[in-house]
A protein has these predicted regions:
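N-terminal first-folded block
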Residues: 1-27
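Small-side-chain structural scaffolding
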Residues: 9, 13, 29, 56, ...
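Glycine-rich, flexible loop/turn motifs
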Residues: 3, 42, 75
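C-terminal structural segments of small proteins and small subunits
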Residues: 51-81
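Low-complexity, compositionally biased segments
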Residues: 9, 39-40, 72
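Short, flexible active-site loop motifs that bind/organize anionic cofactors or intermediates
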Residues: 2, 47, 65
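A short, structured beta-strand/loop element
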Residues: 23-59
Length: 81
């Protein structure tokens, strides 16, 4: 699947909230998200850029997929991307 080229950082954070991520703080132009489930914890920083660069988006999605034991395609489907 191709990654969207017009996705904003705030929109990505909103879609990640469907997976249980919560915004815990905002510092400057970055959002800090945390996911807690079953004793596991994952922290993630997302820039609020308009739009996110493809390499940045790919790196964020790769990190989430590894933390959640999902493939990239499964993650994209869950996020409706």
């Amino acid at each position: 699947m191709k990654l969207p080229r017009d996705l904003h950082g705030e929109e990505l954070a909103k879609r990640l909230s469907r997976l249980g991520y919560q915004v815990v703080r905002q510092t400057g132009s970055h959002l800090r998200l945390t996911w807690n489930e079953g004793g596991q914890e994952h922290h993630l920083t997302i820039p609020r850029h308009h739009p996110l660069k493809l390499g940045t988006l790919a790196g964020i999605l790769r990190e989430i997929a590894e933390a959640r034991n999902l493939t990239r395609e499964e993650l994209l489907k869950l996020l409706d991307l």
